[in-house]
């Protein structure tokens, strides 16, 4: 039985991407990392790698349709928001609205942003007067 081929598709090898990479390594996987440059290049790299699963821990760009529409190779977005929260600036919203609880949601990429099936979620109590970087690099990661 061959091991699951996992690619981390990310805009940068930031703290959350590093954490995902490390956790996957510690779980016995050998994930590859593809940094998002342009749509055509990213699609070529992922197709050539013959990945079974693409995980996007930190992505500023939309997942190309060529990738999310392939049901044999799911693309999972790590969204720094609770189930039902959609769109950019989720952490900014949680902080400015002084949300008492927040979370992280792993959801499958589909045509509509942050609207796919939820694979997993985790909620946490929001610390008082937390900075975005503290939240992102701490509880979210």
Label each PLM-derived region with a short phrase.
Residues 59-141:
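Donor/substrate-binding cores of folate-linked one-carbon enzymes
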Residues 42-50:
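Short amphipathic alpha-helix with an adjacent loop that forms part of the alpha/beta core around
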Residues 17-18, 42-43, 62-65:
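Short, well-ordered alpha-helical microsegments
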């Amino acid at each position: 039985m061959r091991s699951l081929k996992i690619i981390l598709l990310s805009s940068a090898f930031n703290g959350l991407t590093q954490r995902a990479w490390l956790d996957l390594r510690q779980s016995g996987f050998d994930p590859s990392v593809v940094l998002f440059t342009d749509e055509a290049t990213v699609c070529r790299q992922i197709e050539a790698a013959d990945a079974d699963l693409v995980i996007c821990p930190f992505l500023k760009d939309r997942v190309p349709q060529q990738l999310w529409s392939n049901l044999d190779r799911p693309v999972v977005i790590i969204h720094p928001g609770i189930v039902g929260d959609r769109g950019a600036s989720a952490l900014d919203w949680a902080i400015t609205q002084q949300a008492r609880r927040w979370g992280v949601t792993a959801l499958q990429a589909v045509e509509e942003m942050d609207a796919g099936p939820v694979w997993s979620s985790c909620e946490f109590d929001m610390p008082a007067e937390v900075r975005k970087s503290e939240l992102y690099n701490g509880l979210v990661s």
